[in-house]
Design a protein with these regions (language model features):
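Basic, helix-initiating cap at the start of DNA-binding domains
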Residues: 1-26, 30-39, 56
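Short hydrophobic/aromatic patch on the recognition helix
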Residues: 41-51
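Amphipathic alpha-helical segments used for helix-helix packing
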Residues: 96-117, 168-172
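Hydrophobic/aromatic-rich alpha-helical bundle segments in the mid-to-C-terminal region
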Residues: 141-188, 201-204
Length: 204
């Protein structure tokens, strides 16, 4: 790789890192491309060399988070389906909490009120969360942990409803609701009930 290519990769990564920082500080809707390039110390035109618009760079951030979670799952690839799901839920909630409660509230409000680009932002997150969860469940079917007739799409909807409900309750309670404790309780009390009927007997 040439020095020019290395510099291009560094600039692209800097734009990604800065965008993620700024979203955590001020939210997506108030963030402008000018804010990003000013913080990154590059010309505004530089942004468009790597990304077409603000939504595209956020999509890339989501992809990177997806990859980070997948790497953590790969580290416990020999663990059972319950342990993998609990790790995924833990990563899910901690990532949401890293954006601070006022930012998550703004995001939820934007989706409810259908603010500019809010539908696309909500869809992006839902698609990536759904894909990650499906991959975990499909792998469990292939490994004979879950039965071949496991209703994966239905289970994904049930589980994601629980996860999204947790960070919604966190916002509604002004932070008094503890999402991490809720995840732990969900894993210990509800999860086996939800997927228990589809687990192979030898794996229960």
């Amino acid at each position: 790789m040439s020095a020019r290519q290395e510099n291009a990769l560094k600039t692209r990564q800097k734009l990604l890192d800065v965008t993620n920082e700024l979203i955590k500080e001020k939210g997506f809707y108030k963030l402008s491309i000018g804010d990003i390039t000013e913080r990154a110390g590059v010309a505004k035109g530089t942004f468009y060399i790597y990304f077409r618009h603000k939504e595209e760079i956020v999509l890339e951030i989501c992809k990177n988070l997806f990859k980070e979670t997948q790497l953590k799952l790969d580290e416990i690839k020999d663990s059972n389906i319950i342990e993998k799901l609990c790790l995924y839920f833990d990563c899910f909630i901690k990532e949401v909490q890293s954006y601070k409660i006022h930012i998550v509230r703004e995001w939820l409000k934007g989706i409810v009120e259908k603010k500019e680009n809010s539908d696309s932002m909500g869809t992006i997150k839902w698609l990536y969360d759904n894909e990650m969860l499906k991959n975990i469940l499909f792998e469990a079917v292939e490994n004979k942990e879950l039965k071949s007739n496991t209703p994966i799409n239905t289970l994904c909807e049930i589980i994601l409803t629980q996860m999204y409900g947790m960070f919604t309750c966190w916002c509604m309670s002004d932070g008094n609701f503890n999402p991490e404790k809720a995840v732990k309780d969900f894993c210990e009390i509800q999860l086996k009930t939800i997927i228990g009927n589809y687990m192979e007997n030898k794996r229960r």
